């Protein structure tokens, strides 16, 4: 193989209109009529194993290009056929370079990127990242927007990893939940537990002692007097009524428990006495609980005394 690069667009396999197609033996290559004069359209082939003589052929100006010396099937040779973009494998072309040493796509891409973008700007950015001025500008920007910025790692090789916390946007709505470091704290409209002073508690207890249920007018008067809202006074009275109900219920349960215990002890004492008397054979007559005297009995008693 002589190493001649054959380009299919210049040398198609099938002939164009008006061309003659000749079958070539194995081991040879086809050349279109582009390499010859248009008056004599004829395809020829050259063998890859023969030595290259010299032959000059006329052709169209657009098709005259150098392919190197080649021997044609039919007895002629072609030399000084120059190409601008295609050359020998061993030679270096201006358009595509050496074919024996393929160009890496990565290097080609890097070269194009270097030509497209200014490398000095990247260098200045790297210098800024190294000296910390970039961090200062980011912090200043974060302070203006209300974001919290924390450096996760030191800038290295033009890469700076920053962890941005959720910003509190100025266009937010009050009903939107607040996310970020304040989660779990009292944020927004969450109410705290109301604490009452000793004076307020004393006045409320005095009012509850006389009136367990308040009217609207009295509630308004207490709110102005104690500096509380009507809702706070209403809730306090509700809680106080529940507390009073619970205390009274516990007191009733305690009294009923004590009475049951006394009755049980009395009954057990009488039963023990009766069992002891029955064992000894003694019969005790119970004394009547009350003596009822009629009128006749009183008259009889008086006569007995006077006599």
UniProtKB/Swiss-Prot annotation:
Organism superkingdom: Eukaryota
UniProt name for this protein: Homeobox protein HB1
Keyword terms, alphabetized: Developmental protein, DNA-binding, Homeobox, Nucleus
Annotation: DNA-binding region: 189-248
Gene Ontology cellular-component annotations: nucleus
Motif mapping: Antp-type hexapeptide: 172-177
Family in the record: Belongs to the Antp homeobox family.
Record localization: Nucleus
Swiss-Prot/TrEMBL GO biological process terms: anterior/posterior pattern specification
Pfam family, one: Homeodomain
Any one GO molecular function term: RNA polymerase II cis-regulatory region sequence-specific DNA binding
Protein species of origin: Tripneustes gratilla (Hawaian sea urchin)
Region (Disordered) residue spans: 42-62, 246-277
């Amino acid at each position: 193989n002589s190493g001649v690069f054959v380009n299919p667009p210049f040398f198609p396999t099938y002939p164009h209109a008006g061309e003659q197609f000749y079958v070539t033996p194995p081991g040879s290559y086809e050349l279109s009529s582009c390499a010859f004069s248009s008056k004599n359209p004829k395809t020829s082939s050259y063998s890859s194993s023969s030595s290259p003589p010299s032959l000059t052929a006329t052709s169209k100006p657009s098709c005259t290009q150098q392919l190197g010396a080649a021997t044609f099937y039919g007895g002629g040779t072609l030399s000084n056929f120059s190409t601008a973009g295609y050359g020998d494998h061993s030679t270096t072309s201006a358009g595509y370079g050496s074919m024996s040493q393929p160009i890496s796509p990565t290097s080609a891409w890097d070269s194009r990127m270097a030509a497209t973008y200014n490398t000095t700007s990247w260098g200045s950015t790297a210098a800024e990242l190294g000296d910390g001025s970039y961090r200062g500008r980011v912090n200043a920007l974060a302070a203006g927007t209300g974001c919290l910025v924390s450096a996760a790692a030191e800038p290295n090789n033009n890469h700076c990893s920053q962890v941005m916390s959720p910003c509190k946007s100025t266009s937010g709505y009050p009903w939107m939940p607040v996310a970020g470091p304040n989660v779990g704290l009292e944020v927004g409209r969450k109410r705290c537990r109301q604490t009452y002073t000793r004076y307020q508690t004393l006045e409320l207890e005095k009012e509850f002692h006389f009136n367990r249920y308040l009217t609207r007018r009295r509630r308004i008067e207490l709110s102005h007097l104690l500096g509380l809202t009507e809702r706070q006074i209403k809730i306090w009275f509700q809680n106080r009524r529940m507390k009073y109900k619970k205390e009274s219920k516990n007191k009733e349960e305690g009294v009923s428990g004590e009475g049951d215990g006394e009755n049980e002890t009395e009954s057990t004492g009488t039963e023990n006495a009766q069992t002891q008397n029955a064992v000894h054979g003694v019969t005790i007559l119970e004394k009547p609980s009350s003596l009822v005297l009629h009128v006749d009995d009183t008259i009889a008693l008086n006569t007995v005394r006077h006599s």
